[in-house]
């Protein structure tokens, strides 16, 4: 049996794997509460049913994997013994053909739902062409990115899948070339103070305690990178964020570690569709997980950050005329 679970794995999930629904004996002994996020704690979303509109078609019951909804005597009811309690995924509202269900709480309200437009969806070839056109852009025109464009990028990135709603991803926006440069140099100054941690001497001392791949990563990439950043900073050159006119840092707190990266990926695709170039910068986040208290305070970042990544944006100086065929390390079927 192969089990893949997005989001944190909680004890109640493990129990459910081995004691699938119904598990009334379990829930009768233990209080069921919704899975925690940094934004909502363990608050449950609240489901309401308009019985005058409901036809008990069962679609909402089918899509609710929390078992928060049940049909009894041909009447849709709220289950008093769900798996976790409503997490506010909104599937029941989105699937109901009669607008008979509403969900409030965990940042959701009825105004957040809107009708899908299915007549203007891009086909495979259109999406594939967008993806093939995308390149990592590090050379930008000296031109600011308008607020309207920034808002569109953020709106599209906010639709990214998440391990558990509501999203725990935060976004720090640096919306000018000057702010991006100041952030870069502040971070490089932090690296300068931490340089002893990634020096050849330190690496030699740590070698017996490191995995081979980690050792090679530090030796071949991290140490030369830190040295290059600090030396170029002395020449007033920004090779960290390349003097981009716009940068966004996507970070997570309690969230699934993948969430910031998925949102950042959506942001790069939004930028491509809007005529911007973008590039993911992964060299900042790892250093801020357990250090940089004053730096994080200055930029409004949480003191306890998990995974994070920066995306730089701008109008590209260079236009590419070819795409590149990429491949996975391997693909196999089992």
Which stretches of residues belong to each language-model region?
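Acidic, surface-exposed loops and disordered segments
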Residues: 4-9, 18-334
